[in-house]
Amino acid sequence: MNFNKKTIEDVQVKGKKVLVRCDFNVPLKDGVITDENRLNGAMPTIKYLVDNGAKVILCSHMGKPKGEAKPEFSLAPVAKRLSEMLGKEVVFAADDNVVGENAKKAVAEMKDGDVVLLQNTRYRKEETKNGEELSKELASLAEMFVNDAFGTAHRAHCSTVGVTEYLKPAVCGYLIQKELKFLGDAVETPERPFVAILGGAKVSDKINVINNLLEKVDTLIIGGGMAYTFLKAQGYTVGSSLVEEDKVEYAKEMLAKAEEKGVKLLLPVDHRVAKEFKDVEAVVTEDQNIAEGFMGLDIGPKTEAIYAEAIKDAKTVIWNGPMGVFEFENFNKGTIAVAKAMAEADATTIIGGGDSAAAVNILGFGDKMSHISTGGGASLEFLEGKVLPGIAALNDK
């Protein structure tokens, strides 16, 4: 996949109607946005276009309304908040069919530097099927397309891929440009030693990531629930910990592949365990083995030290997935230790979206990282070496 894409700075935007696909899939409570990270992420691109006299038409999905106009998925609160953040009115085109009379009228009346937000693209069933009709309707509003929604770049939808068939040039905004720079450099030309840290509950979610990263990294660190499947593959006892029995063979293959490639594969050497899946006081094991009746819920202190040491020596670090049950105060220590080691590392540090991003932000280490990806699923597919349709559809430099 070519990561060298045209950006908003490579095209003339003044006086042009520009359709911008943003990621405004934000959490709402009683009509109020509870996490503005994604709105903040979209600001540099929107501001650049406004300041350079473009007519800015924003579009996004939110949640899963499944092709119905459900009011709880309306982007009206987003338009209101964007108006406050930009210090100028963002006109909301409240069409249940997304590109309707309101949208057409609002766009026709735009002056340079004006901003319009369309209704939730997933109000239309064909959005997620990459249907021709909606793609054409979206394209008909504008003279060029900007994709700045990395979070949906792994989806071939009307507003990410279909629209580019009918609307050229198609370029990336600052957010996607930054994602491509950090993730692209890491998987293509990392500064070494290159360390990847994978956590989270399931091996099955990360099969292709493990396989692909073993071709690229110097050290692979595994924590979280998926570590127990690997430990079982090595012959350790894991008590009643989460194990994917059908992935034990696969874990054996990956351990062999790491050895063959000369990759250090680090697994926990001790654990924090409990008798049930609850936030109770942790028992720390002596070694890799977990006794009958206990389940591993976090990595142990010896493991923390080993992982922190590997991170400290690295020049590039990518992390995806917590080391334990981060929601439980007694079992968030491993995740905190990894976040802290990354914050202190003299390296390019990349957080691959999802739970790790939330953890790093909650712990207050966000500004210490080189890059926090805005796409959980998209960054995982990127690390799998897959082509992301939303990126592939943009014009190369």
Swiss-Prot record:
Gene3D superfamilies to which the protein is assigned, alphabetical: Phosphoglycerate kinase, N-terminal domain
Domain of life: Bacteria
GO biological process, one term: gluconeogenesis
EC number(s) stated in the UniProt entry for this protein: 2.7.2.3
Keyword flag Nucleotide-binding: yes
Pathway: Carbohydrate degradation; glycolysis; pyruvate from D-glyceraldehyde 3-phosphate: step 2/5
Catalyzed reactions per annotation: (2R)-3-phosphoglycerate + ATP = (2R)-3-phospho-glyceroyl phosphate + ADP
Keyword ATP-binding in annotation: yes
Annotated binding of substrate, by residue: D23, F24, N25, R38, H61, M62, G63, K64, R122, R155
GO cellular component: cytosol
GO molecular function: ADP binding; ATP binding; phosphoglycerate kinase activity
Subcellular location as annotated: Cytoplasm
Sites where the protein binds ATP: K206, G296, E327, G353, G354, D355, S356
Pfam family, one: PGK
Keywords linked to the UniProt accession: ATP-binding, Cytoplasm, Glycolysis, Kinase, Nucleotide-binding, Transferase
The family this protein is said to belong to: Belongs to the phosphoglycerate kinase family.
HAMAP family documented for this protein: Phosphoglyc_kinase
Summary of subunit composition and partner proteins: Monomer.
Name the record gives this protein: Phosphoglycerate kinase
